[in-house]
Amino acid sequence: DIHPIVTTHHIGKKYILLTNEETNTDLTQIAVTQLKAGETAEEHLHPTMEEFFLFQKGDAIMTVNKEQIVCSSGDFISIPANTLHSLKAVTDIEIITIGCALR
């Protein structure tokens, strides 16, 4: 069983499916992330990692370099390293998140 943990942004919860310790790749993590309506991952960046989001359910607003993007089920967002981004759940959301370390 995969047990949920609090996200690194101290909101919502995530179920970690795979980490870099479990593979010989540049992958940092694959997780299913769940946020409740109104929860926000404040603006931040990752200097050594690219991040990818596949929205599974719900509606959210992803802000990338000050540009707001409305996201819903089926949407895929790619965030390059060193790119400011934030995420606000408009409704309860579920996202597959993938992090990949830079080479």
Question: What do the PLM-derived regions correspond to, one by one?
Answer:
Residues 81-103:
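Ligand-binding loop in jelly-roll beta-barrel domains
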Residues 31-47:
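Conserved short histidine dyad/triad with adjacent acidic residue
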